[in-house]
Amino acid sequence: TRKKRCPYTKYQTLELEKEFLFNMYLTRDRRYEVARILNLTERQVKIWFQNRRMKMKKMS
């Protein structure tokens, strides 16, 4: 069964954006850290970064 879709909090988005500015690609260890700090799954973090990179590609 699928988990209900829930938007990221302002805080989570801000932290993910900060991390993205610092580095567009995460190592496995860093992804684990970010997920733990923001109380998200590693999969959510991974996919957020994928989507963010695509958004950047589209904007350029």
Swiss-Prot record:
Which Gene Ontology cellular component annotation is one that this UniProt entry carries? nucleus
Q: What does the UniProt entry say about where the protein is found?
A: Nucleus
- Tell me which SMART domains the record gives: HOX
The record's annotation in SUPFAM superfamilies points to: Homeodomain-like
* Keywords, in A-Z order: Developmental protein, DNA-binding, Homeobox, Nucleus, Transcription, Transcription regulation
What is the disulfide pattern of this chain?
none
> Which InterPro entries would you find in this protein's record?
HD, HD_metazoa, Homeobox_CS, Homeodomain-like_sf, HXA10/ABDB-like
Query: Residues annotated as DNA-binding region?
Result: 1-60
Q: One Pfam family, short name please?
A: Homeodomain
The principal location of this protein is nucleus
One MF annotation (Gene Ontology) recorded for this entry: DNA binding
Q: Which CDD domains match?
A: homeodomain
Function noted in UniProt: Sequence-specific transcription factor which is part of a developmental regulatory system that provides cells with specific positional identities on the anterior-posterior axis.
User: What family does this belong to?
Assistant: Belongs to the Abd-B homeobox family.
Q: What is this protein called?
A: Homeobox protein Hox-D9
Taxonomy-wise, where does this protein's organism fall, top ranks first? Eukaryota, Metazoa, Chordata, Craniata, Vertebrata
